[in-house]
Amino acid sequence: MSASVRGNSKNPQSTSAITTLTDKLLEDISGDFETLQKQFSEKLETMSTRLDQLEESMREAMNKKSSVSPVTSTE
């Protein structure tokens, strides 16, 4: 390792800048993750609602079909 690189690792300003940058990046990533998590949860809720509606429609169609009496031919 060169002397200049070793010197930078002991430089408080350099360390502080790296720490600040790292903290900022972690905050950004955390914010992005929270946004994605919220969007994902909203999409799951929407899908769940749509599936519930589909199940209800199918249930109604099955009940309607079973309540219709069969037509008998008189010929």
Swiss-Prot record:
GO MF annotations in UniProt: transcription corepressor activity
A Pfam family recorded for this sequence: HSBP1
InterPro entries named in the record: HS1-bd
Listed GO CC annotations: cytosol; nucleus
Coiled coil: none
Family as reported in the entry's similarity comment: Belongs to the HSBP1 family.
Name used for this protein in its record: Uncharacterized protein C16E9.15
Source organism per UniProt: Schizosaccharomyces pombe (strain 972 / ATCC 24843)
